[in-house]
Amino acid sequence: ACRAIAVSTVQEALTLGDLEVNNEFALPFAVRVQSAFLGWPALIQDELLDWLRRSHAATRSGDRTLTSAVAQEFEAFVDRVREARHNAPPDQDISTELMHTRIDGRPLDLRELASVLRNWTVGEVGTISASVGILLHWLATHPDWQQRLREQPALLPPAIDEVLRIDGPLV
């Protein structure tokens, strides 16, 4: 799934001409990959991407009322996902498994579920998009390695690991 998402995101980016890597490539890719991991339908990816942008803006603003309103939007979003999966088996995907999780004999309520998914989604999307940006910057500044990796694609996994070890997304 990740490879197909990467290919389609690259193909879309190639149609743009000039490209702002983070907003027009890394962030959309991260949202798509995270949505696939969570088992969320592709139809809600644009909505999630818009929500993430509003969430980042609200956080930067320091306005607690705005931040709270954006958090409520995510709860409504999660509630729709939960309703759509109400009768799904717990092993359908990771989101459904979480929705069937019981703590002290009771299921997670909407607020708890939204909190876990919000922290997970925002954190993972940030890490994935930062990693993509770091890797693209590294490739742009190391044309010799671009060529070497084109000629020897088997080197990609260790090269990616090494670049992200040197310049990690969480630093």
List where the protein language model places each region:
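Cytochrome P450
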Residues: 1-171
